[in-house]
Amino acid sequence: MENLESIWKDITSRKMYITGACGALYDGTSPDGTCYEPDSIQKVHQSYGRPYQLPNSTAHNETCANIGNLLFNWRMFQTSGNARYVDIVENCLYNSILSGISLDGKRYFYTNPLRISADLPYTLRWPKQRTEYISCFCCPPHTLRTLCQAQNYAYTLSPEGIYCNLYGANTLTTNWKDKGELALVQETDYPWEGNVRVTLNKVPRKA
C-alpha cells in the first residue's frame, strides 16, 4: 500500500490536471534512458512526462487514461475507505471523462486538451474536435461502459455504515447483508447548487 500511495501522490500532486485528466504526453522524450543505455535520451509515447509538465494546447489526456485514473482511485478507496480517493473519482467522472463524449452521444474525443487553438505552428496527431469515428477506437466503448456503470460508484456499504460517494438526485433501495433493508432519497441540484438533502426512509434494525 505504501508504494501505491507514493504513486498516487506523484500523480495527483505533480502530473494531473485540474480536471482529473492525466497522461499529458502523446510523444515526448525522457532523460532517464533505458536499462541498457541509462545515459541516453529515450523517446516515450503516451506517457505522464516530468513533474508539472502539463501543457494546455498539446495535452494528450486520452479519455481511456482519465477513466484509468478513476478506476485506480476507486480501488484505492475500496482498500482504504479514505474519501480523498472518491474526490478524484468524482473529478474525473464529471470533467475529464464527460469531455470525451458529445451531448448527443455520437461524437468522441480521443484526447482532451484544456485549450484548443487553430494557430499552432505544428500539426497535432488527433483532431481538435469530437468525431464520430476514431481510428484507435478504444475510448468510445470505454466511455459508454463507464457512464453506464456510474451508479455503481454512488454508494458503498461497509460493516461500519454507508458511504455517499457521489452527489446527485437519486433513490437507493438495497439489502444490507444480514442487517436488513435500507432505503434513502437524495435530493439536490448538484452540481449547479451545493445543497444536498438525504432522507432515510427505511433503516436496518441492526444498523
Where is each model-derived feature located?
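Glycan-recognition and catalytic cores of secretory/periplasmic carbohydrate-active enzymes
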Residues: 1-207
